[in-house]
Amino acid sequence: MKYDVAVIGAGPAGSASALKLSSLGYKTLIIDPCDTKKVCAGILTAQYVRKYGINHDFVERKLKGSRISFRDVHAEITYREAVEYSINRESYDRFNLNEAIIAGSLLCKDKVLSVEENRSAILIRTNNETITADYAILASGISDLSKLFGGTKKYAFCVQQKKFIEPDDYYEIDLQPGAYSWVAPKKDHVLTGTSSLVGYPDIPGEKSLIPLGPVKKTFSKRFLLVGDAAGFVSPFEGEGLYYSRRSGEIAAETLSDVMAGKNKLSDYQVRWKKEFDFSALSMISYLISNNMILEAFVRSTRDSEEFNNFVENILTGENKKFKIQEIGLLIKMLSKIIN
């Protein structure tokens, strides 16, 4: 059987793509061995909740806010109106995949060995068969396959552990120049994670890679890159669930138009760039990339209500398209403290 679209990967980006395409009547196949665990804090930001709502089947805790720290300087951000949730990532992925299957997507539980892109189709070889599709969406995260097709090659090395200690209702982020650690509260335990730019931290736990920014080109003749494969995460704290799901939808919408003869695949890049503004967040990450400025950043968050509100907007996704004036506020306030 030839499919309209093959979706490689059944995470939030892949399932969102498949759900949208199947709902529009396209013959869609999801390919994923469904045997891997994802290193993920599992936080649904206020931006995500505003866009998609919440299903409490996979929610483990409603969050009151976040704490950020650098060395012995700590700041607490209690959200004014934003609502965020800590989720069970495996349950979340199963829920999204099931929604796509209910909508009509087929699931191939197999590992992709190779992909060939030619003028007329995509040929995908798995352990057990060769699959043909008109187009493909690559939603397999950071992998050898995604790198082969232009996926992100800039990433951090992360290790995550489950610890059975009493959780509270705050997500904790320990900032370091070029890296960060986190404590994500769950129902009866916490997930602690540590990242590094130079290799996996020497601690036990589940290992994974987290992208450090979007790739230059997210499309080819018959391929679209989505989610982590495209590098879609916040440069500030690595949040990626909103970007994964939304990029999957944008990819599906673009392919629907392409198959209807209305657009080209390159339109995908135009569309996601209109919605995702990583430049301001990258600038913020760059500004706090040394110890002195980072300490001033956390201290300002602790001591200034105005600055605390600014950081809340970053963490909750309340305003992902920061204005130049807001970046100027950051520079001005940090300069006062440093001087």
Predicted regions and their residues:
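Predominantly flavin-linked oxidoreductase catalytic cores and closely associated redox partners
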Residues: 10, 99-207, 211-219, 231
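N-terminal FAD cofactor-binding segment of flavoenzymes
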Residues: 33-70
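Glycine-rich FAD pyrophosphate-binding loop
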Residues: 10, 22-40
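FAD/FMN-dependent oxidoreductases across multiple families
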Residues: 114, 130, 195-262, 266-270, ...
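N-terminal Rossmann-fold NAD(P) dinucleotide-binding loop
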Residues: 14
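Beta1/beta-strand and adjacent pyrophosphate-binding region of the FAD-binding site
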Residues: 1-11
